[in-house]
């Protein structure tokens, strides 16, 4: 069976991506990164998703981006209730580049020629590393920088959610049997994975379920 490394954050998008990769016949190797994120319960969610969706292996890599800083997700910076103009403070500098590079390294080790990530350019928070141009550029890099690329096997970077709305992602996940109740999206999630209901991630997630006409399985700490 062909193999793929899938970035798994523990959120709803990456859970849907695993299911989509499996539907395409890939044996999934899920990679999560403990990068110093304040909402560490997403890693607990990643473990739940990996177990529930039957991945071949789930690896958690430690890369402490707090030493670099520059984000409300790693530093002592308040997470805003809503996104504003420009790139938000929840952007983690070069995060997707770093994570995809780690996934690329593991792909070489396990013999996978395909990487999957859950980046989205429709209902998203304005991060530069979620754009189609970034995904295409990273695929070029992957083929220039690896043994598989140089030897002609070719590496592909898949972003199957790139042009889907959050509602579309919910519908696809439901179609594929994804249990979104296992996932955590909130930037302020507590240790038990309960969501704040107010941050940008929570608002996008709630709107996705509402627009899809699907009951929201999110566990909230605060309702208002």
Swiss-Prot record:
Binding positions for Zn(2+) per the UniProt entry: 186, 196, 199, 202
Cross-referenced InterPro entries: QueC, Rossmann-like_a/b/a_fold
GO terms (BP aspect): queuosine biosynthetic process
Textual note on the cofactor: Binds 1 zinc ion per subunit.
Positions of ATP binding: 8-18
A GO MF term: ATP binding
UniProt keyword terms in alphabetical order: ATP-binding, Ligase, Metal-binding, Nucleotide-binding, Queuosine biosynthesis, Zinc
Gene3D superfamilies membership: HUPs (3.40.50.620)
Enzyme class per UniProt: ligase
Annotated catalysed reactions: 7-carboxy-7-deazaguanine + NH4(+) + ATP = 7-cyano-7-deazaguanine + ADP + phosphate + H2O + H(+)
Required cofactor names: Zn(2+)
Pathway: Purine metabolism; 7-cyano-7-deazaguanine biosynthesis
The enzyme's E.C. designation: 6.3.4.20
Protein family per UniProt: Belongs to the QueC family.
Function comment: Catalyzes the ATP-dependent conversion of 7-carboxy-7-deazaguanine (CDG) to 7-cyano-7-deazaguanine (preQ(0)).
Classification via PANTHER family: 7-CYANO-7-DEAZAGUANINE SYNTHASE (PTHR42914:SF1)
Protein name (record): 7-cyano-7-deazaguanine synthase
Taxonomic source organism: Xanthomonas oryzae pv. oryzae (strain KACC10331 / KXO85)
